[in-house]
Amino acid sequence: MKNGTTRSWCSILQMALVLVALAHLAYSSDKKPQAYRDINAIGHREIGYPTGVGNWYSLDKEKEIGTQASATFEKSTSLLRDPLTESYLDRLAQTIARNSDAQLPIMIRVIDSEDCYALTFAGGHLYITRGLLLRLQNKGELAASIARGVAHTALRSATGEATRTRLLGIAGFPVIGQDPPLPVNGTDSAFADKLVLLSYRRKDELAADYFGIQYLYKSGYAPECFGSFVQKAWPSSAKATFSPFPPLKTRLDALQKEINEILPKQSSAITDTEDFEAFRRHLLELPLPKPFPKQPVLIHSGSQKLD
């Protein structure tokens, strides 16, 4: 009798977890509230996976995890330590952050590599390669790259995905297509390590496009620059971040639809500036990048359990 009661409670618990998991999946559906379409509501709306059922990690916890992940990543990655470059990118990143829904501070660094890709870690840590910086043709495309990373931060994509993976794992369902899988149990540092290689789901990638182009527009840049940035970064970023990006045409069509239906016409929008040309010339004058590992060497540095 006791065993039967235990099994019944286990079944009830599993069903409850299934419902919670389904609620989380429903939260990430394609339906978008009116506020998501309102440019004037930017900065006054919560677009990301909210703390609770949709996200088991508080903003403070996410910030802590992101700090651990970026520190681990940087131990095996060559960064471009150039004050002029860092200052230029930081000013642009802060401008976009002020015109976004991000609830975490934004930090941006340059990976000293000729490869072309960008990375966004939990907690507002953005990385862009020197190769991608040199491939971009104008300041609008650079702003688009940063706006997309800011959108991932606002969406809380990393910890939202981690929560969904853990929910489905606890409920007894194998998570298909998660590469690499996040641990259900483990240390904070191990979890941070996994975030380094976390592949965002297709819906999260489309959402980053959807909100990123709004932040680009709100910051005064021509929204068309977002599409041209995606076309330049698409092949390399898909390979470098191990993410299941949607087809390029799907993304470009969605961006054009958003431009036509949501973004009001601008009387004057920034595409390029003289300071960008000076910035690009400065990059070309710097010494060539030094070789570094293609993938970060994951270093475990703590043993504190996840809350």
Q: Language-model segments: what does each one mean?
A:
Residues 18-26:
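Hydrophobic h-region of N-terminal signal peptides that target proteins for export
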Residues 11-14, 26-71, 78, 98-117, ...:
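C-terminal capping/extension segments of zinc metalloprotease domains
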Residues 130-144:
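Short pre-active-site segment immediately N-terminal to the catalytic Zn-binding motif
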Residues 2-15:
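Bacterial N-terminal signal peptides that target proteins for export
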